């Protein structure tokens, strides 16, 4: 993990110094002084607009002409229009800076910031820049045994001086705890499925959360059978690896305060079962447990901050595999709620896992609010692509709060429709419901949401986040490499902090 240190200006000792310049290309007195120290290098660079325009996100690394100094490079970072800067933009700028200096093989970087930028204090800006750099520093190369030394290069340290280092440190420490939740989510999601079996994954959850004073219970197939979880168990019955239900209870508020329940789909690998998927890109189905990973990452972020809230996380961990013992299309399963479901397609398995998991959370903890997170449908990818996750909810206020939280951390949500017509589409001729709609290719994400909605108890606020299009990416972003994004952790942490802290 990138080492970030807030220190006094005279203690800065770095190879590269970051310089913020907006699109007006005007230097304040501090930058004029720095420019003079470097023999006009900054002013000469910005005078040539072919080299640097101050556009937001533009990064220009220029070698220092002062041979005797410790600073070997100046890193010009474009702010664009200061009036248009947001927390998201500042944080992502930190990520862009980190990525550029990494490519330039610069081991240590520094930032001196004493003045406000737009409406943000120097300590606020510094904490956001550092947070973005930290998130962008993530790597998953543990299985790359033949990497060349040059490809293993990482930025070692980021030293920052502000007009209030104590405040900057305090702000960043919170960001760092959230990043640890994001990194766990990315790590476990990126792991190959032969490494993260349900048992191993469950043990990793317990190892990290029990150190944060979170009570963790791991239910095996015998316990789930006794509870009547026929839907979840049906999905996993074709696998040699036993299914697990992991229950994480964090009590940061008083015992009488209501719980928030976070429920995650944890299909460790999804072949589609007997309704077998095409082989093309099937390897990406290791990411079909990203909803569960987001729940665990959120629990880490919340518990490590010791937030004064009561939260329970429930994740169903299964493998959807074909075998002689696998669930068949046409099978009928009885859920923990007592309702029955006809399994018309074994590749619509995530909703079956969630049906029992959300019911368990409600029965045991009586939460005021249930939010489930799942890479549930390909239909949501068709609808929203890789930009938005779908948000379905029975409560307008809850949906609005989630969408607002998502906007604030750039984990976007788009409200999707629920309607009685969609609900009718999952009626079955022989059971209480079917696990797919009866109109082929129609409203697939909405019918899936309605399946889960049938397991939400009276009076419970509920939201379903379908993250199938945003959980992993085939290209890097400003805040991380390609692969697992860690989507949902920062969104849910922000939502909880804004709405449930006592």
From Swiss-Prot:
Keywords per UniProt: Aminopeptidase, Cytoplasm, Hydrolase, Manganese, Metal-binding, Protease
Cofactor needs: Mn(2+)
TM regions (residue ranges): none
Subcellular location: Cytoplasm
Catalytic residues in the record: 277, 351
Matches recorded under InterPro entries: Leucine_aapep/pepB, Macro_dom-like, Peptidase_M17_C, Peptidase_M17_leu_NH2_pept, Peptidase_M17_N
Function: Presumably involved in the processing and regular turnover of intracellular proteins. Catalyzes the removal of unsubstituted N-terminal amino acids from various peptides.
UniProt protein name: Probable cytosol aminopeptidase
Organism whose genome encodes this protein: Rickettsia bellii (strain RML369-C)
């Amino acid at each position: 993990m990138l080492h970030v240190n807030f220190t006094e200006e005279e203690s800065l000792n770095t190879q590269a110094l970051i310089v913020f310049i907006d699109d007006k290309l005007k230097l304040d007195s501090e930058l004029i002084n720095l420019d003079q120290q470097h023999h006009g290098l900054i002013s000469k660079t910005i005078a040539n607009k072919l080299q640097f325009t101050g556009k937001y996100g533009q990064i220009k690394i220029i070698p220092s002409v002062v041979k005797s100094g410790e600073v070997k490079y100046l890193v010009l970072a474009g702010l664009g229009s200061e009036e248009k800067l947001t927390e998201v933009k500042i944080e992502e700028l930190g990520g862009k800076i980190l990525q550029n200096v990494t490519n330039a093989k610069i081991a240590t970087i520094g930032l001196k910031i004493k003045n406000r930028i737009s409406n943000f204090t120097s300590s606020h800006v510094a904490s956001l820049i550092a947070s973005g750099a930290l998130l962008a520093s993530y790597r998953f190369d543990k299985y790359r045994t033949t990497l060349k030394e040059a490809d293993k290069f990482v930025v070692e340290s980021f030293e920052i001086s502000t007009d209030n280092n104590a405040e900057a440190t305090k702000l960043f420490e919170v960001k760092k705890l959230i990043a640890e939740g994001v990194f766990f989510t990315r790590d476990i999601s990126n792991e190959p499925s032969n490494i993260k079996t349900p048992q191993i994954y469950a043990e990793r959850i317990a190892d990290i959360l029990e150190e944060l004073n979170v009570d963790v219970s791991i239910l095996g197939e015998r316990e789930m059978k006794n509870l009547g979880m026929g839907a979840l168990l049906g999905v996993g019955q074709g696998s040699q690896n036993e299914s697990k239900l992991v229950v994480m209870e964090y009590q940061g508020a008083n015992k009488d305060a209501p719980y928030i329940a976070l429920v995650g789909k944890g299909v460790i690998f999804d072949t589609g079962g007997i309704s077998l998927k095409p082989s093309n890109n099937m390897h990406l189905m290791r990411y079909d447990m990203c909803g569960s990973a987001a729940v665990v990452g959120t629990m880490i972020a919340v518990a490590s901050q010791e937030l004064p809230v009561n939260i329970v996380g429930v994740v169903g961990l299964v493998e959807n595999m074909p075998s002689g013992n696998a669930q068949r299309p046409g099978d009928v399963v009885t859920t923990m709620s007592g309702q029955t479901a006809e399994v018309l397609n074994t590749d619509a398995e995530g909703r079956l896992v969630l049906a029992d998991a959300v019911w368990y959370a409600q029965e045991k903890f009586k939460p005021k609010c249930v939010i489930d997170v799942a890479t549930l449908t390909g239909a949501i990818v068709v609808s929203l692509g890789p930009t938005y996750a779908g948000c379905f909810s029975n409560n307008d206020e809850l949906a609005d709060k989630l969408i607002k939280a998502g906007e604030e951390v750039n984990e976007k949500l788009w409200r999707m429709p629920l309607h009685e017509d969609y609900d009718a589409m999952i009626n079955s001729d022989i059971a209480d419901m079917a696990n797919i709609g009866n109109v082929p290719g129609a409203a697939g994400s909405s019918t899936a949401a309605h399946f889960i909605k049938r397991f939400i108890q009276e009076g419970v606020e509920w939201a379903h986040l379908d993250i199938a299009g945003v959980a992993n990416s085939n290209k890097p972003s400003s805040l991380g490499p390609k692969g697992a994004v860690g989507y949902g952790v920062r969104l849910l942490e922000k939502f909880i902090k804004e709405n449930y802290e006592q």
